[in-house]
Amino acid sequence: MSTPKDIERNIEFEFVRATENAALNSIHWMGRGQKEMADAAACDAINGVFDLVDIRGEVVIGEGIKDNAPGIFLGDRLGTWKEDSPRFDIALDPIDGTSNIAKGMPNSISVISAAYVPDGQENGMVNIPSFYSEKLAFGPQISEAIRLRELAPITLDNPFEKTLIVAAAALNKRISDLVIVVLDRPRNQKYIDIVRNEGASLRLIADGDIAAAVAPSLPDSGVDLYVGIGGTPEGILTASALKALGGEILLRMWPRDEPEREELLKSVSQADLEKVYTTDELVTGESAIFCATGISDSPLLPGVKLVGNTATTHSILMRARSQTVRYIRAVHNLGTKTINLRSIKRETNV
């Protein structure tokens, strides 16, 4: 009888194949100003891979509704759904950074995370219904220093100025040496102003905040904190990566206006609306798998490199249970490489 560990080992590279194919099928839309077409190409490739994989995958975090684009939606089924196949909760963003692809800019990746759901267990990931959330991500070095040196905890309720002080103390840095990444949106102006006023180094990104939020947990990324209001699905995908890396993301729902707040309160309590979720609360259990493939260069991964008749992809694969992190460089011969697309129900050349 297969154990959860065996099931994860058997299936994890299928998830990498899905993000690789999404990157290869969407790279042709780089810089062409049509983010919906790039997103559709990535979704088609991901669906095509899972049409051949014996799992019962249910999408608990999708990307299509928020982006108003063709997508893979909440409740969609991935896999063959054969009776005895393993069940997975799946969160994905076929392209995190669609605007970047459309503009030919860096910082776009294809991302999938999954959590094995044993029989009798309800779910492996939490579905947060808000479009946007307040998010704060930091690496294991900060978490460990707070625990061992009894520093003040980092929370979303603290003024961000205090968070900078704690982070600097935990990392044995001056505040002026901290590097903070913020999504460049008007709703994040408060954080932008604080970082500048306190003298820390600010890195603004135009789109694609999963890679940015994972970066503080990666050695040599040069990023210390990620903060700001961004997409909730991206936050949960980030949590599955940080589960393997030992980092932390704090997340709280952020209604854009009163009508959205009232709509959210139809499905969640006031306490849940105000709750700050931790990594372990967003991704329960130890079975999370996270994988991503670079489309254009990002702090997390290099993008697809097209040279002559070859395409080189760079992917990352993480498992929370073993805390193993694999970097995968694959060279694809475009003369022989084929991918399965759901739209045409067959294999085709890239």
Segment roles from a protein language model:
Residues 2-4, 11, 215-350:
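Oxyanion/phosphate-interacting regions
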Residues 1-22:
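N-terminal hydrophobic or amphipathic helices/low-complexity stretches enriched
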Residues 117-204, 298-305, 310-344, 348:
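Acidic beta-strand-loop-alpha-helix segment within the catalytic core
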Residues 84-95, 99-135, 139, 171, ...:
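Active-site-adjacent structural elements in enzyme catalytic cores
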Residues 39-120:
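Flexible, acidic active-site loops/lids enriched in D/E/S/T/G that coordinate Mg2+ and/or position polar
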Residues 66-68, 187, 206-213:
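Short acidic loop-to-helix transition motifs that present clustered carboxylates
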